[in-house]
């Protein structure tokens, strides 16, 4: 494995791990950083699937007690059954819209200008949601009903626009629909499991021919491990952070980063308009 290729794999593994579960858009950061370091083409498509699996494994491991508790409790515990139903209800809207529009969105919207615009708009919405007074109806994920799940699932569909952020849309959706900050964040993590596994499986099947080159295995392995490690650090850090802070810091980061991309484009510093994810 070439040194620069290993460095690219490491950088993008770090980016995926740190941004996947923070409300700042992992896809948006991947598109922008990959373009800056010149990592693209078919190898990049396959690589992105692999590093997403690393991030998924991290959140499953971090919440393993809850995950295994739900699985073991499904046959007999109403709480586990209700939680599973809520998760499936929240997952379905993304499945329907993803199958219908994924290719169109990837073709037309996977570029840094769309990402930057979505980062700014999403940041403004996040600030509004945090400052808006709302009554907390749900303090823990086990208190949710199917209506909460459906609304959050619909909010997650906004994340099909790169730069919006899957975790950002579900967390802010949860806050607006009556969940506490902790409950909204945890449900976002749980919802990521079926959503990301489904997306990775769909993309993996669609691009299955890209995995026939065994020479890329060391690159994929490095990206997977790095993504897993940094995703676990990000999940733990976010849970500690939101215990005593709002999401305003992430909102301002989104706005600043998005405006920086748009400014460099307008000034001609970087020709983002021709870049593709």
Swiss-Prot record:
Q: Which GO terms describe its cellular component?
A: plasma membrane
Where it sits in the cell: the answer is: Cell inner membrane
Membrane topology type: Multi-pass membrane protein
Q: Which UniProt keywords apply?
A: Antibiotic resistance, Cell inner membrane, Cell membrane, Cell shape, Cell wall biogenesis/degradation, Hydrolase, Membrane, Peptidoglycan synthesis, Transmembrane, Transmembrane helix
Does the keyword Membrane belong to this entry?
yes
> Single GO molecular-function term?
undecaprenyl-diphosphatase activity
Q: Which residues form the signal peptide?
A: none
Q: Which InterPro entries match?
A: UppP
Main location (coarse class): membrane
Q: Which residues are listed as membrane-spanning? A: 53-73, 85-105, 108-128, 183-203, 215-235, 250-270
Looking at the keywords, is Repressor present?
no
Reaction(s) catalysed by this chain, per the record, are:
di-trans,octa-cis-undecaprenyl diphosphate + H2O = di-trans,octa-cis-undecaprenyl phosphate + phosphate + H(+)
The EC number(s) given in the record are 3.6.1.27
Any GO BP: peptidoglycan biosynthetic process
Q: Which domain of life is it from?
A: Bacteria
Another remark in the UniProt entry says:
Bacitracin is thought to be involved in the inhibition of peptidoglycan synthesis by sequestering undecaprenyl diphosphate, thereby reducing the pool of lipid carrier available.
Protein family according to the UniProt entry:
Belongs to the UppP family.
Q: What does this protein do?
A: Catalyzes the dephosphorylation of undecaprenyl diphosphate (UPP). Confers resistance to bacitracin.
Protein name, entry field: Undecaprenyl-diphosphatase
């Amino acid at each position: 494995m070439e040194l620069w290729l290993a460095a690219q794999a490491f950088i993008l593994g770090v980016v995926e791990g740190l941004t996947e579960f923070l409300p700042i858009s992992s896809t948006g950061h991947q598109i922008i950083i990959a373009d800056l370091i010149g990592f693209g083409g078919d190898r990049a498509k396959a690589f992105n699937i692999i590093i997403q699996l690393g991030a998924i494994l991290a959140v499953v491991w971090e919440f393993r007690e809850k995950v295994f508790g739900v699985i073991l409790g499904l046959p007999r515990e109403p709480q586990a059954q209700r939680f599973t139903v809520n998760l499936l209800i929240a997952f379905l809207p993304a499945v329907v819209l993803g199958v219908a529009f994924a290719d169109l969105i990837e073709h037309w919207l996977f570029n840094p200008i769309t990402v930057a615009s979505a980062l700014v708009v999403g940041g403004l919405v996040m600030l509004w949601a945090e400052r808006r007074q709302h009554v907390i109806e749900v303090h823990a994920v086990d208190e949710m009903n199917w209506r909460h799940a459906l609304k959050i699932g619909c909010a997650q569909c906004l994340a099909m626009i790169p730069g919006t952020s899957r975790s950002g849309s579900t967390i802010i959706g949860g806050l607006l629909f009556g969940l506490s900050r902790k409950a909204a964040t945890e449900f976002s993590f749980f919802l990521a499991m079926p959503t990301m596994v489904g997306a990775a499986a769909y993309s993996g099947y669609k691009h299955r021919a890209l995995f026939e080159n065994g020479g890329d295995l060391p690159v994929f392995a490095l990206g997977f491990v790095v993504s897993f490690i940094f995703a676990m650090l990000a999940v733990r850090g976010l849970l500690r952070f939101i215990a005593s802070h709002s999401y305003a810091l992430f909102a301002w980061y989104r706005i600043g980063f998005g405006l920086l991309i748009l400014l460099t484009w307008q000034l001609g510093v970087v020709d983002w308009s021709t870049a593709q994810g």
